[in-house]
């Protein structure tokens, strides 16, 4: 990773680091560390970044939404501090193209993997915190998460269970995921849709909702719950 690449990343982030080693580490996946033994990878920074992000978002919500209950604030925070939101940030700054990883990881789709990009965002937050301090990283987080915060407050975030399901299944190789509309009922202005999700010709989830998209998301969520339960 040369200094021109680092400058490009810094411009995308809106942060210019004093310690570029922190930025390099934040962008280094563990697979790269396994391939190049001297490389420090980003898992420890990710651990710290998660806590920094939680603190800054919690503090912001606490100070700015005094009419919200603890339960409401917790729900809002869970929509902001989650893998899907982190992935949205990663996409905006084209983070996937800068992450250092092994050739094997890249060949199997690692550069597009949601979890890898989300983890890298948390690692970058930690790197900014260590390099610039809590005041700077607070402003950095609020700048990049502003749109997501507003959507969470206005209840406009739809959890993308379909993408998460695809991400989970990609770990085991190529699979065929199909969403099948089985029926709908109710008047046109309040129609309810029912959908199955079929994975490699096997029924794995059922969902319903007042749009086809909502029904598919709920079917994907049920499939995720089943699959993640099997992995425990």
From Swiss-Prot:
Belongs to the ribonuclease III family. It comes from the Bacteria. It comes from Clostridium beijerinckii (strain ATCC 51743 / NCIMB 8052) (Clostridium acetobutylicum). Its cofactor is Mg(2+). Its main location: cytoplasm. Digests double-stranded RNA. Involved in the processing of primary rRNA transcript to yield the immediate precursors to the large and small rRNAs (23S and 16S). Processes some mRNAs, and tRNAs when they are encoded in the rRNA operon. Processes pre-crRNA and tracrRNA of type II CRISPR loci if present in the organism. Its EC number is 3.1.26.3. It catalyses: Endonucleolytic cleavage to 5'-phosphomonoester. It is an enzyme of class 3 (hydrolase). This is Ribonuclease 3. Mg(2+) binds at residues 46, 119, 122. GO terms for molecular function: double-stranded RNA binding; metal ion binding; ribonuclease III activity; rRNA binding. Homodimer. Keywords: Cytoplasm, Endonuclease, Hydrolase, Magnesium, Metal-binding, mRNA processing, Nuclease, RNA-binding, rRNA processing, rRNA-binding, tRNA processing. Residues 160-229 form the DRBM domain. The gene is rnc. One of its GO terms (biological process) is rRNA processing. Residues 6-133 form the RNase III domain.
